[in-house]
């Protein structure tokens, strides 16, 4: 995913 505030899960 990434590291956005709504998805703090690493890629």
Swiss-Prot record:
Keywords: Hypotensive agent, Metalloenzyme inhibitor, Metalloprotease inhibitor, Protease inhibitor, Pyrrolidone carboxylic acid, Secreted, Toxin
GO molecular function, one term: peptidase inhibitor activity
Similarity annotation: Belongs to the bradykinin-potentiating peptide family.
Compartments it resides in: Secreted
Organism name: Crotalus viridis viridis
Any one GO cellular component localisation term in the record: extracellular region
Pyrrolidone carboxylic acid: residues bearing it: 1
Primary location class: secreted
Protein's name in the database: Bradykinin-potentiating peptide 11b
Tissue: Expressed by the venom gland.
GO biological process: regulation of blood pressure
Species lineage: Eukaryota, Metazoa, Chordata, Craniata, Vertebrata
Keyword Secreted on entry: yes
């Amino acid at each position: 995913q990434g590291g956005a505030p709504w998805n703090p899960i690493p890629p």
